[in-house]
Design a protein with these regions (language model features):
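Cleavable N-terminal signal peptides of Sec/SRP-targeted secreted and luminal proteins
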Residues: 2-17
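Intrinsically disordered, flexible peripheral segments
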Residues: 17-763
Length: 763
């Protein structure tokens, strides 16, 4: 009897533990976004470490997928997943990449398991089990996509990818210094700290400089743009864009919110990234993006200086790399065949794939073009047992294959990926922009086949832009602290305490700009809804020559677009740079975000006010190109057009203060029927283009140049030790200030950073 009683008490204790856990996270949290948010944070914390959270361990170890097949809406997905487990999936600790077909199929299967969980309870149980048993990279990727596409995960904020896995965003020398601090428990020689750029705050937080003036891996003048291509905000933007619009996801699965004009926005995002990159090239007096010629060498190499968690270094591509070799000559031929097929289809106005005819002659057929280049063409099948990557998406895969990782002629499962093979790092490599320019030419050809916009399509009867005034535009470089604590392992004591004793931050130099406003005076003879679009583009090329509008229109970046209600008479529209469409300020460190989430009472209000565009947003820092010290001449193009609302739209979508979090600020402009990039997306007939409801105005971007302590320290410790100063010739720049970045700011740690440390905002 006593033993039975003890058994019952033991079972009761175990049951109570789970009951309390489920009450906290699941039962009471069915409508509690705050508790769901905290649980996702736990799942993605210290992803490379063994699980230390007992609640997640208990859920994961006590959940048996085999005995709960009925908890998923697509049971064939579960059966397929269990079969893969028997065969064996990518082990923990290995590098994950979407470019390997087998790894792609595995991670898509993992996503389907999470996506087709019947309820949030099953979703969390499945995620906890996966966190314990599956490859870390696959788990993070699948969970991230699932959170963005499940209806019951709306409003959940994900930790930025550079905190989850810092290895893709922090240089290898900084990682090495972080391990040095960890191994020596912070007991470093003061001179060594000064040489390495390591500081310690009063609260014991370690700050390591990522010195942009250390140019040992510079191979050519393209390295002057590293401040832009390696910006953590820009690479996060591109990664989350892929998460919202994965190339492998069927239309019948993808979230309805982002399904509308899915492939048009994909093409437009790539075109805009190219345009934004080109503005930085002009700022640095570099020429246009050189097209990728498969019959020639890649003149510009790239040294990533990145090392992964398992010690694998991302490969270097040296200058003058030969593209076509005996090993890949067949792939190069296949690329040309695919390009010819798409080109001929655009010219003919249609293409046939497996008996399916697809038109390519109407404006709305841009969806077909996007599928041909970046997506999947299927016959609206609902089967999920097979990941479909046929049609011409192989064009992009093949282009990457001849330059980076080659999965086409190799059956390797364990690989060394290049920077091109990960969405977190692809923008770093200059050849990425050459590849995308080659693909973007197909979009330009498609748009060229469409007629120019008529005056009737451009004009807004009764509406006139009287004046546009732009504040002085000034850019500069400042300090940004990024939490890289997850890059170093926990010791046994820390594992027991479930957190690291050290906080390690990396100080990065990032482009920024002074806050500015754009004021537009509009006269209207009626009260009417309208769409206001603002584009920023160059006036001159890198040599100071005026650019023809038809050649230049592809270089204009859409910095703002919004809906507005005009009233009869004069309207003064004031747009602040911090309020422009779909931009995001610097993301909070996850450790600070967790503290806020735990203490606030109205989580949804916090999301709307403080975390707007947190996932979808383009970095506010990069709204303007760097410009030049003496000023870079630019043009701001503003156009006001009538709102042609898409049929069946809920008008409450226009209210950006809504707390139901169903507003996707990346695509609110899609409420208007006009094409993305209108009216600069098509060939311009200068005889009919200019109308009263549009205006071009000149503006100048100035770059503020000051002294950086990273540079002075480099000069003090490195250059003075040698009789010969490094005389590497980089393009037409002999001044070190023009190499890499014209970094500014004070000789000491940024005053704002010090102030935050004093106030206790940074531990």
């Amino acid at each position: 009897m006593k033993s039975v009683l003890c058994l019952l008490l033991g079972l009761a204790a175990i049951a109570a533990k789970f009951i309390n856990l489920y009450i906290f996270f699941l039962v009471n949290g069915v409508g509690d976004l705050k508790q769901r948010q905290l649980l996702i944070f736990k799942l993605l914390n210290n992803i490379l470490e063994p699980l230390v959270d007992k609640d997640i361990i208990d859920i994961g170890t006590n959940f048996d997928i085999r005995n709960n097949v009925e908890l998923y809406t697509k049971q064939e997905v579960v059966k397929g997943f269990l079969n893969r487990l028997k065969v064996g999936m990518l082990p923990r600790g290995e590098v994950f990449t979407l470019q390997i077909d087998r790894q792609l199929k595995e991670v898509v299967n993992i996503f389907h398991m999470l996506y087709f969980a019947k309820d949030f309870d099953t979703f969390i149980k499945t995620a906890c089990w996966m966190r314990l048993n599956l490859n870390e990279g696959m788990f993070v990727y699948a969970l991230t996509v699932a959170v963005r596409h499940r209806e019951d995960c709306k409003g959940i904020i994900l930790p930025p990818p550079y905190e989850i896995y810092p290895y893709y965003f922090v240089r290898a020398d900084v990682i090495q210094k972080a391990y040095l601090i960890k191994m020596k428990r912070g007991l470093l020689d003061e001179k060594l700290c000064d040489l390495y750029g390591i500081r310690v705050t009063e609260k014991g937080t370690y700050i390591i400089d990522e010195n942009v003036f250390d140019k040992r891996v510079a191979l050519n003048d393209e390295d002057r743009l590293r401040y832009f291509t390696e910006d953590i905000g820009l690479n996060t933007y591109y990664y989350y864009f892929h998460i919202d619009y994965p190339f492998w996801m069927n239309d019948n699965i993808i979230n309805n919110k982002v399904k509308t004009r899915r492939w048009e926005i994909t093409l437009y995002i790539y075109q805009q990234i190219l345009a934004r990159y080109n503005l930085e090239r002009i700022s640095n007096r570099m020429g246009d993006i050189v097209g990728l010629d498969l019959n020639k060498t890649i003149k510009k190499g790239y040294w990533p200086w990145l090392v992964l968690h398992n010690g694998v270094q991302l490969p270097v591509r040296l200058n003058n790399k030969i593209i076509t070799t005996d090993k890949n000559v067949q792939i190069v031929k296949l690329i040309k065949v695919y390009e010819n097929i798409i080109t001929e289809a655009i010219i003919k106005g249609f293409v046939e794939i497996n008996g399916l005819r697809l038109d390519l002659h109407k404006p709305e057929d841009i969806e077909v073009l996007g599928k041909l280049i970046y997506g999947v063409v299927d016959k609206h099948t609902t089967t999920l047992s097979k990941t479909s990557v046929e049609a011409y998406r192989y064009l992009l895969l093949l282009l990457k294959a001849v330059i980076g990782l080659n999965p086409v002629e190799s059956d390797k499962y364990f690989v060394v990926p290049t920077v091109l093979d990960s969405y977190q790092t692809a923008l770093r490599d200059p050849v990425f922009y050459q590849i995308q320019k080659r693909l973007c030419n197909l979009l330009i050809l498609f748009k060229k086949r469409l007629p120019c916009y008529t005056r009737e399509e451009l004009i807004f009867p009764g509406v006139k832009i009287d004046n546009v005034v732009v504040d002085k535009l000034v850019t500069y470089f400042d300090d940004h602290l990024m939490d890289m604590t997850n890059a170093v392992i926990l010791n046994n004591d820390e594992l027991k305490k479930t957190k690291s004793d050290m906080t390690i931050l990396v100080r990065k130099r990032r482009l920024n700009h002074q806050r500015f406003k754009v004021v537009v005076d509009v006269t209207s003879d009626k009260t009417v809804d309208c769409v206001v679009r603002m584009f920023l583009g160059p006036k001159e090329d890198g040599l100071g020559r005026l650019i023809d509008i038809n050649k230049n229109r592809h270089n204009f970046v859409e910095i703002d677009s919004f809906l507005y209600k005009l009233v009869t008479g004069k309207n003064t529209i004031v747009r602040d740079s911090i309020d422009m469409h779909n931009i995001v300020r610097d993301r909070l460190m996850t450790r600070d975000l967790v503290k806020k989430v735990e203490t606030i009472t109205d989580f949804k209000d916090f999301l709307v006010k403080d975390l707007r565009n947190y996932i979808t947003g383009f970095p506010a820092r990069l709204l303007l190109p760097k410009g030049r010290t003496g000023g870079l001449k630019m043009m701001l193009y503003v156009i006001v057009t009538p709102l042609k609302l898409v049929d069946g739209v809920d008008l409450s979508m226009l209210d950006v203060t809504r707390k139901d979090l169903l507003v996707d600020f990346r695509s609110t402009v899609l409420l208007d029927k006009m094409p993305l990039g209108f009216p600069l997306d098509r060939e311009i007939d200068v005889g009919t283009f200019f109308t009263p409801n549009m205006k071009f105005v000149d503006c100048v971007i100035f770059h503020k140049q000051q002294v950086c302590d990273m540079k002075t320290r480099w000069n003090r410790w490195v250059l003075k030790q040698y009789d010969l100063v490094d005389q590497t010739f980089i393009g037409d720049n002999f001044n070190i200030n023009n190499y890499n970045v014209d970094v500014d700011i004070t000789r000491d740690l940024n005053r704002d950073v010090l102030e935050n440390i004093k106030l206790g905002k940074i531990d």
